[in-house]
Amino acid sequence: MTPFLRILNRTSLVTQIVIGLLAGIALALLAPAIARDLAFLGKVFVSALKAVAPVLVFILVMASVANHRHGQETHIRPILWLYLLGTFAAAVVAVFASMLFPSHLALSTSEATLSAPGGIAEVLQNLLLNAVDNPVNALLNANFIGVLTWAIGLGVALRHAGETTRTVVEDLSNGVTLIVRVVIRFAPLGIFGLVSSTLAQSGLDALLGYLHLLAVLIGCMLFVALVMNPLIVFWKIRRNPYPLTLLCLRESGITAFFTRSSAANIPVNLALSERLGLHEDTYSVSIPLGATINMAGAAITITVLTLAAVHTLGIQVDLPTAVLLSVVAAVCACGASGVAGGSLLLIPLACSLFGIPSEIAMQVVAVGFIIGVLQDSAETALNSSTDVLFTAAACQAQEQRHG
């Protein structure tokens, strides 16, 4: 292995993305002509994301549904409902924040034609038509609603298949996830090309747009962590929720912020649950499950970035469509775990509700990677700390009822 590759392997992806980001800004300011010529790096990265996203959603969802263990949720139904309520509430907060503080992105719309929906009826009609699309056509044209429908359908059918078949599906899922990891490893180069060319063409206004977007995202996550989650916990335990909320943020959220992985934070959450004296039979199931489906941060990311694209393109959004987006974002978020940049790669699915084509949706995904250094850390901190918070709230409420 060459010294360069050794350094590359030792340096974390976050550090590489920061270096790519700073190098892109520097090049755009010092040599705008060269920066414009390097736009192809960003285009290659976005094309790779476009290629892998439909296959990723199809295989991942199918494997998840096919390998679901029957009866898993029966022990933890109250916690499961808290997870779903928290994720939906986060999406609603993100919708209102995006309406109050609309973000505008520097997107290239020349390569695609827009077909904005007329209202909720048309959105639902398009949703139904997309859901019954030919599966091969859905994969080719990145029709994520169709891909999702076929993935769930096949997953349910394969539940009754033999163990060997389900193992093959799981292996396929691992293979696709590995390919996604390889694509994500090229994020620093892609971001370097995207930032340098965008700044060279649009000036510093584009960067200020990203800062505004990041402020909306982090603001939503803080609001959910410090206002919405405590309200849900108070409704459950009927006493001051803040000691428990702040304990979970301090003990679980800070670790998750730096590891940027809900899965890596599972041992931390299990240890905290034990210290809180919760039932082991409950938390040993609910914490790993929460790392998979409790995705309030992902719901915020999907909603805010989708509505940023909508505002940039001048598409009008009525209230029923915004509520539908909240539901779709919450459902999408549940499938975003375990994949690097998972929530970002599900943005095209939400964008398709508004008739935004894949070419533009993937530019929004690329913007997500640019701000991902902070966005992903904050998202993981919210997701993981909420796992242990809702588990503790449900266990304490159960004790109060029986005590």
Swiss-Prot record:
Location of the protein in the cell: Cell inner membrane
GO terms of biological process kind: serine transport; threonine transport
Keyword Transport among record annotations: yes
A Pfam family per the record: SDF
Keyword annotations of the record: Amino-acid transport, Cell inner membrane, Cell membrane, Membrane, Symport, Transmembrane, Transmembrane helix, Transport
Gene Ontology MF term list: neutral L-amino acid:sodium symporter activity
Known function: Involved in the import of serine and threonine into the cell, with the concomitant import of sodium (symport system).
NCBIfam families per UniProt: PRK13628.1
Name under which the protein is recorded: Serine/threonine transporter SstT
